């Protein structure tokens, strides 16, 4: 087993107190989050509704953190420009949501932000390598998209290893990162790091009230010691 390495941690704002998103964004910043992950759901691609460009803009006004917008929507082309205007720094679209993936990823980059491609748990990643040159990040969903609080899907680990091998083979180690989204906690994070993940997105684990402070949970997810002053 390879040595665990520190990763980037991005809390999903969907798990926060939605009545005070500005305050929550500031708390995430102060706790040492690397970025904020914003889930956009349209009620069709996934069976839930969440935010729109106005919420992205409000969060952007509340924090200096990098904003990652995860578009779990059909017809993503229609919304890219509004997401960018609202303050998105990276936009993730789903492989299952469009037939023109390469064109979509290229368009996102043309708009001046980073582009990511997400794969839902039941989608084969057999053809992932052909899309990697167009991506700044590839997102492997480790829960079914739509709701927080789900358990980590163990078969994600072999997907991470597959993606890591493909990125290395294509010589994209410095330009394409692997992100794992869903069910990330103290148990699943080390497995993801060991398999080759670069970025972890977490929600329930980070926001649930227990004896650990938020900043300590972030350090644990990164694989770093906490409680040392």
Swiss-Prot record:
SUPFAM superfamilies reported for this sequence: Ribulose-phoshate binding barrel
Sites where the protein binds a divalent metal cation: 37, 39, 70, 181
The keyword Secreted is assigned to this record: no
InterPro entries for this protein: Aldolase_TIM (IPR013785), Ribul_P_3_epim (IPR026019), Ribul_P_3_epim-like (IPR000056), RibuloseP-bd_barrel (IPR011060)
Pathway this chain belongs to: Carbohydrate degradation
Catalytic class of the enzyme: isomerase
Single GO biological process annotation from the record: pentose catabolic process
Presence of keyword Protein biosynthesis: no
EC number(s) stated in the UniProt entry for this protein: 5.1.3.1
Active site: 39, 181
Alphabetically ordered keywords of this record: Carbohydrate metabolism, Isomerase, Metal-binding
Cofactor(s) for this UniProt protein: a divalent metal cation
Record field: catalytic activity: D-ribulose 5-phosphate = D-xylulose 5-phosphate
Disulfide bonds: none
Domain of life: Bacteria
GO molecular function: D-ribulose-phosphate 3-epimerase activity; metal ion binding
UniProt: substrate binding residues: 12, 70, 146-149, 181-183, 203-204
PANTHER family in alphabetical order: RIBULOSE-5-PHOSPHATE-3-EPIMERASE
Name of the protein described by the UniProt record: Ribulose-phosphate 3-epimerase
Annotated organism of origin: Chlamydia pneumoniae
